[in-house]
Amino acid sequence: MTRISLTRYLVEEQRKHNTIEPELRLLIEVVARACKAISNAVSKGALAGVLGSAGTGNVQGETQQKLDVIANEVLLDANEWGGHLAAMASEEMDSFYEIPNRYPKGEYLLLFDPLDGSSNIDVNVSIGTIFSVLHMHKPGQTVTEHDFMQPGTQQVAAGYAVYGPQTTLVLTVGNGVHMFTLDREAGSFVLTQSDVMIPEDTKEFAINMSNMRHWAPPVRRYIDECLAGDEGPRGKNFNMRWIASMVADVHRILTRGGVFMYPWDKREPEKPGKLRLMYEANPMAFLVEQAGGAATNGQQRILDVEPTKLHQRVSVILGSKNEVERVTRYHQEDAAKA
């Protein structure tokens, strides 16, 4: 059977649907190459001296790991000179990075979390890179933060690479979700699963149970019902999974279903959530919806949230459609009582 490379897939998608512009195809290929380089760095670990803290912090106030910094630099260096981008934004940078004048500029904006789940780096658990692509409002003009302030519905592509037992690139350009596995011998990503679909129902949930006492009542209600199992109102037993790496948890959900929850909690009531809207929640919500799932912040569809700042946070509930709709309904019922 003929193996389909990422490049061939993108070319054939353009022929079939006429939705992938040549510049977007080249941009996705550059991001994929950067993910290969990050995968190589991750796989070397202690051999290359890349484990441990970098001794610095990011704009979120989080301690940066050495691989956080390395992955961020790899993505910047790979993408700044190709002529496809006007600017980039990253979890690891205070502000956006405008393409220098010495390079040609394109009409796309690239946003990324260079290494999601970095608390897992030193313990050798799956981590990943998340990315999102937007169109510039007005190509050719000076980039401002306002150009990035687009709802998730405006994404033209999104994906992630998960660095685990295999390195897998998961991608959508608005025509379903497709998975590509890195063939290290050939040095290329090969299509290994097409048109991924998330089951509408599930018996698995992913949440950090240690935070239960801080959750809002709708989230506690949902989890309490899951924990009650076949003796409770749901009439079935649930399993809990939690990897503390959004990429790994979402990859499991895309593979076999489930619901992922990182909700608001009362420790920081002024913050609507922990995860970042622009380069974590939006790309993952795009992927999940393209795979037949749903993604909400409890009150509204994540892709409809209007961003107001680059590092905006949001509550995230995503995965199997019927479970996400149930949690959303619980939030609506709770709001109606207030």
UniProtKB/Swiss-Prot annotation:
GO molecular function, one term: magnesium ion binding
E.C. no: 3.1.3.11
Catalytic activity: beta-D-fructose 1,6-bisphosphate + H2O = beta-D-fructose 6-phosphate + phosphate
Annotated binding of Mg(2+) 1, by residue: 91, 113, 115
Keywords: Carbohydrate metabolism, Cytoplasm, Hydrolase, Magnesium, Metal-binding
A single GO cellular-component term on record: cytosol
Binding site residues for substrate: 116-119, 208, 274
Enzyme class of the recorded protein, top EC level: hydrolase
Positions that bind Mg(2+) 2: 113, 116, 280
Domain of life: Bacteria
Cofactor descriptive note: Binds 2 magnesium ions per subunit.
Cofactor(s) the protein needs: Mg(2+)
Main location, first listed in the record: cytoplasm
Metabolic or biological pathway, per its Swiss-Prot or TrEMBL entry: Carbohydrate biosynthesis; gluconeogenesis
Cellular compartments annotated: Cytoplasm
Listed GO biological process terms: fructose 1,6-bisphosphate metabolic process; fructose 6-phosphate metabolic process; fructose metabolic process; gluconeogenesis; sucrose biosynthetic process
Keyword flag Zinc: no
SUPFAM superfamilies: Carbohydrate phosphatase
Subunit structure as annotated in this protein's UniProt entry: Homotetramer.
Family affiliation: Belongs to the FBPase class 1 family.
Record protein name field: Fructose-1,6-bisphosphatase class 1 1
Taxonomic lineage of the native organism: Bacteria, Pseudomonadati, Pseudomonadota, Betaproteobacteria, Burkholderiales
